C-alpha cells in the first residue's frame, strides 16, 4: 500500500484528519485523538495517546511492506489486527461519522 491508498482506506473506515494526522477519537470526546497515523515520506507510524497525554509509538512500517487484507482491506503490518479493541474503536468512529452525515451534523 502506498500513502494515497492508506489514506483512502483510513478515511473510508472511520479515521479523520486532526492536526495533520489520520486519527481515531474516543466516543465520549470526538474531537480528541487517541490513536493517530503519521504518514511520513517512506514510513507510516501508529501512535497511541497515553492517559498522561503523551504519544507512544505502537508500530512503524515502510509503505512497501504494508499489504491490504484481501477480505477487509485493512493494512497488514501495522499491528491493527492484534491491538485489543482497535477494530471496535474504528467501527465506533465510522458509525459516528455516518450518523452525523445522516442527521446533518
Predicted regions mapped to residue ranges:
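Intrinsically disordered, low-complexity regulatory regions enriched in serine/threonine/proline
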Residues: 1-2, 28-34, 39-105
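Amphipathic alpha-helical segments
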Residues: 1-17
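Short, hydrophobic/aromatic-rich segments at coil-to-beta transitions
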Residues: 18-25
Amino acid at each position: 500500500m502506498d500513502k494515497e491508498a492508506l489514506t483512502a482506506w483510513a478515511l473510508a473506515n472511520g479515521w479523520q484528519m486532526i492536526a495533520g494526522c489520520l486519527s481515531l477519537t474516543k466516543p465520549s470526546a470526538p474531537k480528541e485523538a487517541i490513536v493517530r497515523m503519521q504518514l511520513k515520506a517512506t514510513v507510516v507510524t501508529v501512535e497511541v495517546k497515553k492517559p498522561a497525554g503523551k504519544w507512544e509509538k505502537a508500530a512503524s512500517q515502510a509503505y512497501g511492506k504494508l499489504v491490504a487484507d484481501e477480505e477487509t482491506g485493512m493494512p497488514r503490518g501495522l499491528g491493527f489486527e492484534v491491538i485489543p479493541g482497535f477494530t471496535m474503536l474504528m467501527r465506533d468512529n465510522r458509525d459516528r461519522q455516518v450518523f452525523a452525515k445522516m442527521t446533518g451534523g
